A protein has these predicted regions:
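Solvent-exposed loop/turn segments at secondary-structure junctions
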Residues: 56, 63, 93-97, 118-123, ...
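Acidic/His-rich structured neighborhood in mature extracellular/periplasmic domains
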Residues: 94-145
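Active-site acidic/histidine clusters and adjacent loop/turn architecture
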Residues: 22-89, 154-170, 175-176
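N-terminal signal peptide c-region/cleavage motif recognized by signal peptidases
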Residues: 14-19
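Bacterial N-terminal signal peptides that target proteins for export
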Residues: 1-8
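Extended, low-complexity, intrinsically disordered C-terminal regulatory tails
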Residues: 70-101, 178-205
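Catalytic cores and adjacent binding grooves of peptidoglycan-active enzymes
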Residues: 124-226
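Extracytoplasmic
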Residues: 82-84, 107-111, 174, 213-215
Length: 226
């Protein structure tokens, strides 16, 4: 075999290995599962950032490859659909799934938390601060008026995000299995221009074990081996 042929063969092996590594395989359920070949969400993009550089360094931003594609497709569409809006994603899961303390779920690579998009005291889009002193944002408490200090929840930007996540998931043959968000805020979310579309999503009706006011939890309907 010539040197050129050896080179071509090596490239074919490389691309075959890369293609195989790119596809994740999840097992079980969100509260009792695992994953093979998970991928890490980017730490930041044009209109989004991770909630913590430390958490990213610890590998707490692993997801199923299909979930990653859905999230990134949605963020790309949001650059045009919600110009100026700033998004922050939260916890997702471990590299191999399984128990992900302190969460009860996030075990199969198909669950992701997203911090609420906000506007500052001047009404401008902003990123919600998520310092370690407040458990990387999870200890933040919004009041009944959806305010926290100088920030208020941007329900329009949140609605647009959920719609784009749903569209991106459907475009890839999947969907959204569940959304968990503080039920007291749902009327304001449904009052946005995307209210009718959002009402078709499966929002948790019961009270969750912890208040979901500073973030919304999304389970993606990506199939896993049972």
């Amino acid at each position: 075999m010539t040197q050129i042929h050896y080179g071509l063969a090596a490239l074919l092996v490389f691309f075959a290995a890369s293609a195989g590594a790119a596809a994740s395989r999840c097992h079980g359920t969100v509260n009792r599962g695992s994953i093979e070949g998970s991928v890490r969400l980017p730490a930041e993009g044009a209109n989004f950032t991770a909630y913590s550089t430390l958490a990213v360094a610890m590998g707490r931003n692993h997801v199923h490859s299909e979930v990653s594609a859905i999230i990134l497709d949605a963020y790309a569409k949001l650059e045009g659909a919600a110009p100026g809006a700033q998004y922050v994603y939260g916890e997702s899961g471990n590299e191999y799934g399984g128990r992900f303390r302190p969460h009860r779920t996030h075990q199969s690579g198909t669950s992701v938390d997203f911090f609420v998009p906000v506007r500052d005291k001047n009404g401008q889009p902003a990123r919600l601060p998520t310092p370690a002193t407040q458990r990387f944002g999870y200890d933040i408490e919004f009041d009944r008026d959806a305010r926290y200090g100088e920030y208020r929840i941007d329900f329009a930007a949140m609605a647009e995000h959920l719609v784009q996540l749903d569209l991106a998931a459907r475009a890839r043959g999947h969907g959204i299995a569940l959304v968990i968000f503080d039920t007291a805020y749902l009327p304001r979310l449904f009052a946005t221009s995307h209210g009718a579309q959002l009402k078709r999503l499966n929002f948790m009706k019961a009270k969750p074990w912890v208040r979901h006011d500073e973030h919304y939890h999304v389970d993606f309907a990506v199939p896993c081996d049972r």
